[in-house]
Amino acid sequence: MSYTPGVGGDPAQLAQRISSNIQKITQCSAEIQRTLNQLGTPQDSPELRQQLQQKQQYTNQLTKETDKYIKEFGSLPTTPSEQRQRKIQKDRLVGEFTTSLTNFQKVQRQAAEREKEFVARVRASSRVSGSFPEDSSKERNLVSWESQTQPQVQVQDEEITEDDLRLIHERESSIRQLEADIMDINEIFKDLGMMIHEQGDVIDSIEANVENAEVHVQQANQQLSRAADYQRKSRKTLCIIILILVIGVVIIGLIIWGLNR
């Protein structure tokens, strides 16, 4: 599976794509675990190991794709009013992705250990011959070494065969790939940690600006309240002065009227 960047810049579609990938990673990890449990049993076969490797590669690609989607989701523009809700949504996706990554890395480590055990058995069996059912299917017999029922063995001085070398090289190559995939997952974990830290700094800055704005609004409201009080007092004083003037005019008018009589 290859990464196809962008879903039209739609946060809802991008979040849905991320959630879908997380579910796939979780499902694939469970399938890988079931396959690992079949290794070393009668169900083991080269075909089964090939399917296991393909499933691991597919899941590893999913993790890289999801990491890019989450980065894209975090870089989408947003308004201050949407910021907190976007952060909650992103934190949820990051948490779910981290859980699925942890499970996948766990089964990857188990797969690497199984491959190392297989190589060790191949190396050991290269100098051991036993009463195996078919000489032509040596790989199947080596894989099922643990499930054999007490074969009669004797040590020989023969050198390691070309088939043994081929098996060892294939498994060692698989081990190197698994270890590289595990390192890739570690890098994704680091990316997720950085994204959470940066997102937290952005939110803290926005919250600080909002708090400062609220303080300024409160101060402005207090100033407006004081101005309104002052205006009411000024109007009251003006009304009293006018009333006094009116009373004074009435009194003067009465005095003049009395003198004229």
Swiss-Prot record:
SMART domains (UniProt xref): SynN, t_SNARE
Function of the protein: May be involved in protein trafficking from the plasma membrane to the early endosome (EE) as well as in homotypic fusion of endocytic organelles. Mediates the endocytic trafficking from early endosomes to late endosomes and lysosomes.
GO cellular component: early endosome membrane; SNARE complex; synaptic vesicle
Chief place where the protein resides: membrane
Stored InterPro entries: SNARE (IPR010989), Syntaxin (IPR045242), Syntaxin/epimorphin_CS (IPR006012), Syntaxin_N (IPR006011), T_SNARE_dom (IPR000727)
Oligomer and partners: Forms a SNARE complex with VTI1B, STX8 and VAMP8 which functions in the homotypic fusion of late endosomes. Component of the SNARE complex composed of STX7, STX8, VAMP7 and VTI1B that is required for heterotypic fusion of late endosomes with lysosomes. Interacts with VPS11, VPS16 and VPS18. Interacts with VPS33A. Interacts with TPC1.
Modified-residue entries (Phosphoserine), positions: S45, S75, S125, S126, S129, S205
Membrane topology designation: Single-pass type IV membrane protein
Region (Disordered): 129-148
SUPFAM superfamilies per UniProt: t-snare proteins
Vesicular side: 260-261
Domain t-SNARE coiled-coil homology intervals: 165-227
Positions where Phosphothreonine occurs in the chain: T4, T79
Bilayer-spanning residue ranges: 239-259
Top-rank taxon: Eukaryota
Molecular function terms, GO-annotated: SNAP receptor activity; SNARE binding
Protein name: Syntaxin-7
